[in-house]
Amino acid sequence: MVVPDLDDVTYDLEVDGEQVRRTLHRRVFERGGWATVAIAFEERASDGSWKPAKLALIRLQRVHEAWKKHAALTMAGTDALALGRALVEWGAAFDGNVDE
């Protein structure tokens, strides 16, 4: 995947005119020549209902005048929530307030 702008990174998917994956939330984290796009999404089950939400993390690198996909990771919603809770617990470390 190569896109000219980070706004062009999408995760929606249609098959034969039917939406089978839809984006619920999206956030871009950009620093220097690297960006991470976090996307909460749902996929359609075979019975037509929507499955529980998942998280996709897409890592992109700036190459000349475009963004090139470098890596991607998909997590179940429960795993994404567990990761979020862990990050909150570790918050002091990210703020530089770790007791030694």
Regions picked out by a protein language model, each given a short descriptive name:
Residues M1-E100:
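Positively charged, low-complexity terminal tracts
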